[in-house]
Amino acid sequence: MKKKEKITIIFLVVSLMTALVLIALLVLKKPDKSGSGKKADTSPTVKTTADAETTSDTEKTTDNEKETTTETPTTAEEETTENPDMLRDNKYNQIAINAKENGQKIVYLTFDDGSGTLTPTVLDTLDKYGVKATFFVVAEYSPSKDFAKDQYNAILAKDHTLGIHSYTHSRANIYQSLDAFKEDIDSIYNYVYELTGFKPYVSRFPGGSSTSFADERMKTEYIPYVKSKGLIYYDWNVSSGDGNGSITSEQVYNNVINGVRNKDVSVVLMHDGSGHEATVEALPRILDTLINEMNCVILPITQSTTPVQADF
């Protein structure tokens, strides 16, 4: 073989090898779209100061949100919504405050010894005049337990105040000892709760706190026991006189109106038990005079009402 031909062959071989190398390099450098050939990054993650601050702020925000959720204070509106007694108390207390500021007389009408056969008529009359009152009930003076249940719940449903007076109203027995007194008060309290699910908070002693049946034990024994049950007791400073069975409706009317004229705040004693027809007859006229002639504000007793109590 001639020398020139050898050189040509060598040149072709070198060129071919060079071409193969270039092709191989191109294939190796071509990106792997599937990522399967990408080397995993096993280097440790380094959190920069900025990253750390951002993370910290995020964590703080999350913590703050948690604290806000768990520590949100109960608003006054939520409290009154949860406690309807408080809402009612505030309502009538504000009316009393406004009445005093306006120079109006305040009258609390109270009815003892129900619920009896006259109670439904009394409730209807109060409804007619848009008036709320207070009822101090006696268990044994109701015609039946079912009747008592209906009337007690009607009193509450109509937004009157339901208080306790006595289970038997037998003063000679009730005041003979502290144990006898406790039995009577506990019995009427539990009776009202059984029939209504309502826990009374106001009471009136049979005969009032100045009754001669109790003597000095009223102050030393009976009043402390009533207070220990969370009860507020109320006497009266105006009497209708309807405890006298021979009284007329005219006399009831005059006793109430004349008594109220002399006071800025009156707690009026009346009765809705059987035998007090004169009171039922006088009631519409009493309400008409108190509201339309004397511009009185008539309210039910609440826990904010200043008690009228006998001096000892």
Please describe what each predicted stretch is.
Residues 169-269, 273-292, 297, 304-312:
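Catalytic domains of cell-wall/extracellular-matrix polysaccharide-remodeling enzymes
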Residues 1-16:
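N-terminal Sec-pathway targeting helices
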Residues 134-136, 163, 204, 234, ...:
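Structural detector of well-ordered beta-strand residues that form the stable sheet scaffold
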Residues 82-199:
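Active-site beta->alpha N-cap acidic-glycine motif
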Residues 17-27:
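Hydrophobic alpha-helical membrane-insertion segments, chiefly the h-region
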Residues 29-104:
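N-terminal, intrinsically disordered, polar/charged segments of Gram-positive cell-envelope systems
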